[in-house]
Amino acid sequence: MAQVEYRGTGRRKNSVARVRLVPGEGNITVNERDVREYLPFESLILDLNQPFDVTETKGNYDVLVNVHGGGFTGQAQAIRHGIARALLEADPEYRGSLKRAGLLTRDPRMKERKKPGLKKARRSPQFSKR
C-alpha cells in the first residue's frame, strides 16, 4: 500500500522549497537535517510552524523539505508557504483560515536591481561640492 503524502511548493525572494507532508509525529527535516540544526534562530522555526498553528494540526504530520537559494529568512518563509499549500492539498477546508492568516499569498517583494552609475539600487555616489 502506498503511503499518503501531500506536496507543496513555496517561494520567497530567491528561495524555493519543495515540501512533503507525511502523517507522523511532527518532525521537520530540512535538506536531510533536523530543522533546529538547519535554521539558526528560534523565531524562524516559530514562523515556519505558523500554518500548523492556524489549522490546529501541530504534531499530525512529518515535514520533509528540500530548499535551496536565498538566506535563512527567505528559506524559512518559503518553507512556510510550501507547508500551507501542502496542508491545503491535504484538506481543502483549511483554505479559509490559511487565507485569513495570509499564508497562501506569495510575497512578491524581490531585491531591486543595481542601476548603472549608482553604488546600489538607489544609493548614489557621494557628492562633493568642491
UniProtKB/Swiss-Prot annotation:
SUPFAM superfamilies: Ribosomal protein S5 domain 2-like (SSF54211). It comes from the Bacteria. Residues 111-130 have a biased composition (Basic residues). The keyword Manganese does not apply. Residues 98-130 are annotated as: Disordered. One of its GO terms (molecular function) is RNA binding. InterPro entries: Ribosomal_Su5_D2-typ_SF, Ribosomal_uS9, Ribosomal_uS9_bac/plastid, Ribosomal_uS9_CS, Ribsml_uS5_D2-typ_fold_subgr. GO terms for biological process: translation. Keywords: Ribonucleoprotein, Ribosomal protein. GO terms for cellular component: cytosolic small ribosomal subunit. Belongs to the universal ribosomal protein uS9 family. NCBIfam families: PRK00132.1. This is Small ribosomal subunit protein uS9. It comes from Staphylococcus haemolyticus (strain JCSC1435).
